[in-house]
Swiss-Prot record:
Keyword tRNA-binding found: no
Pfam families named in the record: SmpB
GO CC list: cytosol
Organism the protein comes from: Sodalis glossinidius (strain morsitans)
Protein name listed in UniProt: SsrA-binding protein
Family: Belongs to the SmpB family.
Sample GO molecular function, one term: RNA binding
InterPro entries associated with the record: SmpB, SsrA-bd_prot, SsrA-bd_prot_CS
PANTHER family named among the record's database cross-references: SSRA-BINDING PROTEIN (PTHR30308:SF2), TMRNA-BINDING COMPONENT OF TRANS-TRANSLATION TAGGING COMPLEX (PTHR30308)
Lineage top rank: taxon: Bacteria
GO biological processes: trans-translation
PROSITE patterns in the cross-refs: SSRP
Amino acid sequence: MTKKKEHKPGSATIAQNKRARHEYFIEQEFEAGLSLQGWEVKSLRAGKANIGDSYVLLKDGEAYLFGATFQPLTVASSHVVCDPMRTRKLLLNKRELDSLFGRVNREGYTVVALSLYWKNAWVKVKIGVAKGKKEYDKRTDIKEREWQLDKSRIMKHASR
């Protein structure tokens, strides 16, 4: 019998959209597959992805990842015309798509990409149903974060 491959230590995360958590209240998260071409998978294995400006576009009953940049490798993309900014189809269940359409159309939410990661041999994208933050919400988040840091510093020095 063959042994199971041991999981290599390290992160399975390829890219994160930290700005999305700063600019939006994330109400609900979904995990979606991505429809990719061969050169895109190779560039993702090399970690050449950026989802900072990406969002999810809903049209014709399907969801698409728009604005994500996958930088092509020169070795892997010599015989193919590569478009690093192409729109990629998201693979979701019908129930999940209906939920997304309902919240975006009726309640005024938007859908943003939060992170890109490996799950076994598949590339997955975590998307979030989000509502935009106001400026004062961002300031309160920053104040809360700074207070947590100050609190941990005080506790560290108090224990000495």
